Design a protein with these regions (language model features):
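Glycine/serine-rich phosphate-binding loop and adjoining beta1-alpha1 elements at the start
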Residues: 2, 8, 77-170, 298-300
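An N-terminal-biased, well-structured beta-alpha scaffold segment characteristic
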Residues: 2-106, 110
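Glycine-rich phosphate/diphosphate-binding loop of Rossmann-like nucleotide-binding domains
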Residues: 6-45, 152-240
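Generic hydrophobic/aromatic pocket-lining and core-packing "Φ" positions
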Residues: 23, 47, 104, 142, ...
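Short glycine-/small-residue-rich Rossmann-like dinucleotide-binding loops
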Residues: 69, 75-76, 95-96, 221, ...
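Adenosine-phosphate binding glycine-rich loop
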Residues: 118-159, 269, 274-370
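Rossmann-like adenosine-cofactor binding region
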Residues: 209-291
Length: 370
């Protein structure tokens, strides 16, 4: 198989889909790997490392997309990449289709086999390719939030950890999943007072055990969320429904009651955000203010630490890349129910129910199309 690795073009996206180590393994297995020049440069993986591993360095994204049987990326294609789509192409990347109907339409129109990292499941039912970036984004969210709490950046001027004689800041984490637990770890490490809000009482019990009672846990309902965000200096949005648009847990009315200069970091923005006032932003223009509250809603937060993020991501994705290359997409999908869960588009048909529900489109199970 010919595997293509283009340079990411989303704003300040610095990660890369395959590392030199991955290239070496693919080439040794008899595959050909085309890497766009400078694709790994911002992840501290220069062209010469890819060449030494056996990759062919290609001068343009056009040729990578045109020649590859399977394109391996990090982020969902942006509009300027839609023209590269063609029938039968296998696209393996984060897709986050629910809030982007235009991308869904293009993938369907061109009959691309779109396999989304974020909806692949393992035998335990977890999301193994979403987990590493959720870990990174969860940890980063508190670092970023702490920075934006500084007065110079429009925040309240609060130090999350406090100092002797001055109480710490309050951090409210919406969602007790991978993002939430990692955000809580960092916030606690900084000395903040941390509250985690989740709908699942069993998950709240688990979190209480994990943190030995050192975090506050709240059952998610309108009353509790309103109170928690009103008291918070920093709110982290980390709600996930795999493949679907994130529910709006924090409403505009709740935001209007928050402290002036408080900060919201909505990590769920990839799936539309769980804060009603959230809208996607970029690393070039990351923050804005609504009702005196600073909002940071960058859709590719882990790109700010590309070396760590690329290694963490590809550790998880590469076994699937190798399986798809070895078996071909159809056979690999047929043999692995977890990989089937990752197929969002196939032969012009939408195959992910949460995306279909979010966009009001018809869908079919991919197993019925094979």
């Amino acid at each position: 198989m010919i595997i293509g690795v283009p340079k990411e073009v989303k704003d300040h996206e610095s990660r890369v889909g395959v590392t030199p180590a991955g290239v070496k393994a693919l080439v040794e297995a008899g595959h050909k790997v085309l890497v766009e020049t400078k694709a790994g440069e911002l992840s501290a993986m220069p062209d010469d490392e890819y060449q030494s591993a056996g990759a062919e360095i290609v001068g343009s994204a056009y040729d990578v997309w045109r020649l590859a049987d399977m394109v391996v990326k990090v982020k969902e294609p942006v509009e300027k990449e839609y023209g590269h789509f063609r029938e039968g192409l296998v696209l393996f990347t984060y897709l986050h289709l629910a809030p982007v109907p235009e991308l869904t339409a293009k993938l369907l129109d061109k009959k691309v086999v779109g396999i989304a990292y974020e909806t692949i499941r393992d035998k335990a039912g977890t999301l193994p390719l979403l987990t590493p970036m959720s870990e990174v984004a969860g940890r980063m969210s508190v670092q970023v939030g702490a920075a934006y709490l500084e007065k110079e950046k429009g925040g309240r001027g609060v130090l999350l950890g406090g100092v002797p004689g001055v109480p710490p800041g309050n951090v409210c984490v919406i969602g007790g999943g991978i993002v939430g637990i990692n955000a809580a770890k960092v916030a606690m490490g900084m000395g903040a007072k941390v509250t985690i809000v989740d709908l699942n009482l069993n998950r709240l019990r688990e979190l209480d055990d994990i943190f030995n009672g050192r975090v506050y846990t709240l059952a998610s309902n309108s009353y509790n969320v309103t109170h928690a965000v009103r008291e918070a200096d920093l709110v982290i949005g980390g709600v996930l429904i795999p493949g679907a648009a994130a529910p709006k847990i924090v409403t505009k009315a709740m935001v209007s009651k928050m402290k002036k200069g408080a900060v919201i970091v909505d990590v769920a923005i990839d799936q539309g955000g769980c804060i009603e006032t959230a809208r996607p932003t970029t690393h070039s223009d990351p923050a804005y203010v609504v009702d005196g509250v600073v909002h940071y809603c960058v859709t590719n937060m882990p790109a700010a630490v590309p070396n760590t993020s690329t290694l963490a991501l590809t550790n998880a994705t590469f076994p699937y890349v190798m399986r798809l290359a070895k078996m071909g997409a159809k056979a690999a999908i047929e043999s692995d129910s977890g990989l089937r869960d990752g197929v969002n588009t196939y032969d012009g048909v939408l195959t992910c129910k949460p995306v279909a529900d979010s966009q009001g489109r018809p869908w079919k199970a991919v197993g019925d199309l094979l």
